[in-house]
Amino acid sequence: MGIPAAFRWLSTKYPKIISPVIEDQPITMPDGTVIPVDATKPNPNGEEFDNLYLDMNGIVHPCSHPEDRPAPKDEEEMMVEVFKYTDRVVNMVRPRKLLMIAVDGVAPRAKMNQQRSRRFRAAREAMEKEEDKQKFVELLKKQNGKPQEEEPVEVVVKKAFDSNSITPGTPFMDILAASLRYWCSYKLNTDPAWANIKVIISDATVPGEGEHKIMEFVRSQRGSPNHDPNTRHVIYGLDADLIMLGLATHEPHFRVLREDVFAQDSRPRLCKICGQKGHDAMNCKGEAKEKNGEFDEKDAVVPLKPFIWLHVSILREYLAIELDVPGLPFQFNLERAIDDWVFMCFFVGNDFLPHLPALEIRENGIDTLTAIWKDNLPVMGGYLTKDGHADLERVQYIMAGLAKQEDAIFRRRKETEDRREAGFKRRKLADEARQRRAQGSRQIRQAAENSGPPAGFSFHKINEFPGKAPQPSITHDMVVNRQAVDQANVANKSAASVLKDQIKSMMAQGTSTPENGAESTETPAETAAAAPATEEQAAPPAALGKRKAELIEDAVAGPEASSTEVTEISESDAEPTDSVRLWEEGYADRYYEQKFKVDRKDIDFRHKVGRAYAEGLAWVLEYYFQGCPSWEWFYPYHYAPFAADFVDLGKMEIKFEKGRISRPFEQLMSVLPAASRHAIPEVFHSLMLEETSEIRHFYPDDFEIDLNGKKMAWQGVALLPFIDMPRLLAAMETKSHLLSPEDHLRNAPGKDYLLLSDSHPTLYDHITSQFYSKKQGTTKFELDPTKSAGLSGLVEKIDGYVPHGSLVYPLSRNSMPDVDYDRSLMVHYFFPDCSHTHKSMLLRGVQMPTPALTRSDIDILKGKASRSGRSYGGVPLSNKNYSGRNEPINYGPGGGQQGGRGRGGYQGGGGRGGGRGGYGGNGGGYQANGGGYYNGGNNGGGGGGYGGQPRDSYGPPPGWQPPPPPGLAGFGVGPPPPPPGAAYGGAPGGAGYGGYGSSRGGYQDNRYALPPPPPQAYQAQGQQYGQGGSRGGYQGQGNQYRGPPRQDRGYDNRGGYRGGGYRGGGDNRGYR
């Protein structure tokens, strides 16, 4: 999913959702014999699982181009690695009923745009790396003065596997599909743990993304009346959207399995250039490979990377607490609330839309949206979503609430970045100062040693400073960063001359320079090596790149370019300029003018973009909950709108047409650059390369990457032209007749496979009796769930397939054995037809897992939930907003009006009819039409409400006295000392006092007394009659008396001392 860092954010916020996987390992005997894991034994994790789903792209990618070991030499080695990895995952989970393997097939058009961006970037990065390697080899030859040995040169220039080949329609995907079918059949023949399980393989010829094909299967089984609601599911994959998909199934027994990518890896990192240990690509010298031992033995076995569980059931527990909104005018439904939360996560990032500018996962953007949702849920009258369909009129409330915070979010983001950058620069300057002092001291001592001591003096011998340093070695990092630091090098040369003068001055009396003329034998490369390593690790990406460039340039330039002076690169050279400047006024005009190339006054265009984005949100929601609503829809812009540009969403009518599913070659031509054309049939190459081709501009050799306010290129936006699909199809049609029969076969849509062993107690006989008995019936029939262990769907006979034949390994080198008597069975499989809508509900008969959260966990989470989303990601509700205006922040349309009972105080400024007074407290006041006396001491009494005749729904407390007459609503100067805790509501038609209630157990008892009257000079000010919530007093909405500046403001009609006065805090919590 397109939410970077989403998994880490979730696991940090909800720590109990993560637990380590307990894994049995194969046993190696002294004679070298390996005893495999016995997966028939009980699962060591203490729970048995029914179904395991593998999103295979998360396995194929790390196996084909690993980071911790040399890449496989060819496709056959890759397949063997895929077999090993998959076997390890299956042995961890030990599914007892079903294994489903899903490979990405043709994707919806909305996904193709993201794939196009990734693949063009990958091709350009591969080309740049290859060019860097070539330059690196040439420099090595020049430095050594002789031709480099053949082996390292071949290793350096060796081309890596093109990961763009992992795309539907390529020969590689054909090899993968055949290999997976072989391996699963082999395991069904040889592994007892596979005897009773069913295997479904959905390869790249079947349209749809792997994880969404898996979810379609789960939804189809839930719709069957024979489905077990307590089925225990595990899905393996690296994408964060698997968590959202798991929640969307509403299956409580669901886990996500993945590698613990944050665990410390004890395996040595290999250089990506030469493949050797001991250094990285930045410090590669291209030296010949050293033998490991006498016979170049392989390394000893290193610990495998651990795996972790993510428990969706425990995440549901956390969300049940965090999303709870008491006092709703309708019944709270946890399943609907979870759907809303998943929907709001799409605002922060997904694979189909650019994320909204104001929302970042690292800034707790999801918490910000959750706070807005909780505040508006009573007003909206219901949930944002229902069974995967969005209510856009209610979505408008969320966007309006976010729009009120956008200015604050952008400004606070800038402040945070500035503080972080300033802190890094301070640390950098301090480190450089330490290095200069140490270098200057070494240079002085060396100069004195080289010139010889004066007569009568002797020095202690210093062994650690040699007379002459070796020539600095050229490294890969010097080459790739040379261009970025040319300007700094020029500046450093002038600083070097200053250093020379200083050294000559210190050596003037009775000293002479060495014969070789070198004032210092300390090389800049050594100076760079003395820099602490922790700085590089802790530095932000932009600053890290700048620091590396400076150190590299010093090493390349030689001793003359080193300097003891601080030579800073100008800001324009250090990092790109953000011309939009979201933190400054007018950012919206600049944004649309620069990003969309439209007139800044064209407001209608902004609303058009907002409507297109809202349509995209509706598409994504339905895609996750019901399946792909349209294969042809896509978002037609590179950038997202602002929240303020979502206008009149409730008037939109969205209806998607299913559309046409692209064929594999059409997707290849849509997403691959010309550099990866080897994966595309040769007949189409001319369309990508020839200038006369009408679609040549779809495949630019170079393209712009807009950093869009980010620091690193990979975070930017690739400005590639969108594919005009009708033109592409028309161009391809002119070449399609030249395709070979094998190509036509690869371009055709495929079917899923169902595999099982002949030892399955019922299903094997159930299928063979229909397809391969003397009484053969139809070639396609519906499975009986009582005989298939609950599996619903249809199966079809494969033409030409005969059971109990031989199983042949499909690749050439026979890395795996053939099986003469194949005991497995293979048929085509089709999901059961689900014409009805998948309901967001728990199924009847489900038994919920044992709760994992303790009372302490719940209390802590409730405390955090009350503040969550109201700090960094948005404006705290208890404070003024960033512009200093006292107005609602998180509320959408309607402000403080909530069904005729405004919240008063900060949230709505009083509303109609005495609302709750100040924020956070059930303020002391009568509601309109006598809605009762509120407890005046709960988190501080709010301002008393006007209007209405009181009823005796709640009687006033003993000893209660009526409030003073109108006109005594506030003070304009400093308040008198507070009396004992009192809480008063307004009389009919009168301006009430805010309560002097307790603040979290502070100043409260059962005595009630009037506050002292204000000075006579101010009694006439601030009178305000009317219905409900007039503010009166200082800063009142009536006769607005503005008291002397910089004085305490007394009662700011927002409840008690501290209601904007005594402490000037405005948090309405009473005197404390």
UniProtKB/Swiss-Prot annotation:
Renumbered to this chain, the Gly residues biased-composition regions fall at: 892-911, 983-1000, 1025-1036, 1056-1072
The record's keywords, sorted A to Z, are: Coiled coil, Exonuclease, Hydrolase, Metal-binding, mRNA processing, Nuclease, Nucleus, rRNA processing, Transcription, Transcription regulation, Transcription termination, Zinc, Zinc-finger
Stretches annotated zinc finger (CCHC-type): 269-286
Protein EC: 3.1.13.-
Bias-annotated ranges (Pro residues): 955-967
What cellular-component terms does GO give this entry?
A: nucleus
Q: Which InterPro entries match?
A: 5_3_exoribonuclease, Xrn1_helical, Xrn1_N, Xrn2/3/4
Q: Chief localization class?
A: nucleus
UniProt enzyme class: hydrolase
Q: Which domain of life is it from?
A: Eukaryota
Protein family (similarity comment)? Belongs to the 5'-3' exonuclease family. XRN2/RAT1 subfamily.
- What is this protein identified as? 5'-3' exoribonuclease 2
- Read off the lineage from the record: Eukaryota, Fungi, Dikarya, Ascomycota, Pezizomycotina
